[in-house]
Amino acid sequence: VLKPSEHSSNTTNILQKIIEKSFERGHVDIVSGGPEIGQKLLELNWDYIFFTGSTEIGKIVASSAAKTLTPVTLELGGNNPCVVDKDVSIKLACKRIIFGKFINCGQTCIAPNFIAVNKKVKQEFLKKLVNELNKTFGKNSHESPYYSRIINKKHVERLSKLIKGYKLIYGGNFNLENNFFEPTVLEVSSIKDNILKDEIFGPILPILSYDTTEELTEILNEYENPLAFYVFSNNISFAESLISNNSFGGGAINDTIGQIVNKKLPFGGVGNSGIGKYHGYESFKTFSHFKPYIIKSNYFDLSFKYKLSEDSLLFKFTRKFLRYISI
């Protein structure tokens, strides 16, 4: 049974057509509706529950599943960092960050949520970021055939409130009538700012800067267990040290969102960003119950296994052997 979001009716219609063409009636079903339908579904006893959504709702799903000991996979959100080192190919980094951030208008769970850029390259980075945005979407992104729209008016309003009071480097325009929200880049002075408290899930890219490794560590430690983690650096030792010392679901060095392309790589979160993993063979394993068993021969039987005397040679040998291998 699939329960898509009530906000994505067009996607639901496409899924319905695919299912009707691919499966016999009754094998796979789609259930439409709002949160009340989702709550009713959670009251049923399932073999497995797979949920994609916010951490807040993920906790509700996990709590409901626990009542019947139903296993779950939770693919949740995350405040995904993107670190830009001083030793970096800036133009290429900008192009790849723009692709990963603004695809589907920033409405992906693995989009970079903010940039932490080294102060030594900050101004050059911002200049080239703006240039690449203009090249990608044109100076009027409203007319670009490559730029998406926000899912609904409610979220356009939410995003418009997020950017109030910030110094805008690029964008900031929106249109409630057609759910347009311009690609937006803004400066953030503190890791405690409201815009960085939660996953943005939209085309807004806050820019933080750091000077020392200690400052960068302080920034990264502020956000627990993101779903994705990105580092742009020509210094692979520096990049790998960040990868090793931070907990996250999956990530990339010198790229964004590329980690989901390889079907052999498992995808999933950790801690607040999710439980379990899937993609490729991992998806098959996720939705399968591995049931081990043996078939015992009836042609011979070892009688001593039923009653092993402490005086027997086999018992003495076994005890000495176990002591030997435990040394």
Question: Where are the regions a protein language model picked out?
Answer:
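Short, well-ordered alpha-helical microsegments
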Residues: 38, 58-59, 239
